[in-house]
Amino acid sequence: MSSLRLGPVSYLVLGITALRGPSTPYDLKRFVQLSIGHFWPFPHTQLYAEPERLAEAGLLEETREEGGRRRRHYTITDAGRERLGEWLEEPVTSPTEIRDLGVLKLFFSELTGIDEIVALAHEQAAAHRAKLAVYDGLMERFADRPELATRLLSVELGMRLAHAAAGFWDDVQSAASASESTASGDWLASITAMRSGSEAASAS
C-alpha cells in the first residue's frame, strides 16, 4: 500500500472519483462547485494537481484521450478505495472550524462605531439568508433522489447554520440600533437576552 501522505484534498479527489467514476480535473472542480464547495471550498489549483500525485502513488489510474483535447481521466483503484475506506472509518477528533470575516470584523468593532456595526450586521444577515436560499434550492432540486440522502445531510447542516447565523446578526443589528455606544453595559445583555428568548421559544 502507498505510504503517500494524504490530506483533505486527497480524500476529496478519491471520494469524488469513487462516487462518479472516471473524472477529469475539470469534472472534479465542477463537482466541488456544485456540492462540497458550499461548506468547504478548495483551491482549483489543488484539484488540478492532486489527481496526478495520487496516480503516481497508485491510488488513481490515469487514462488519456487518444484524440481531441487529450484530456486526462482518473479512476480510483482498489488501493485508493482501501485508503479512502480507512479514512472514512477514522474518528473525527478535530473541532469544527469557523472562519468568518464578518465575525472577525465584529470582534474589532469597538474600534468603529454603532453605525458601522449596524451596517455589518445587516450585510451579514442578508448574506446568510442568500446562502440559505441556495441550500433550499439544492434540497428542492434533489428531493426526489433518495440515493443522495447522506450527501444532502451536509446541506441540511448548512441550512441550520445559515439560519442560526442570520438570526444572530439580526440580534446584533437590533442591539446595536438600540445602543448609543459599543461600551454600553446593555450591549451584551441585550443580545444574550435575545438568545435566551430564542432558546425558550425553541423548547416550547
Residue ranges and their predicted role:
Residues 136-155:
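Acidic interhelical loop/turn segments
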Residues 155-163:
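Extended, low-aromatic, Leu/Ala- and acidic/polar-enriched alpha-helical coiled-coil segments
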Residues 162-175:
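Amphipathic alpha-helical coiled-coil segments
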Residues 176-190:
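Long amphipathic alpha-helical coiled-coil segments
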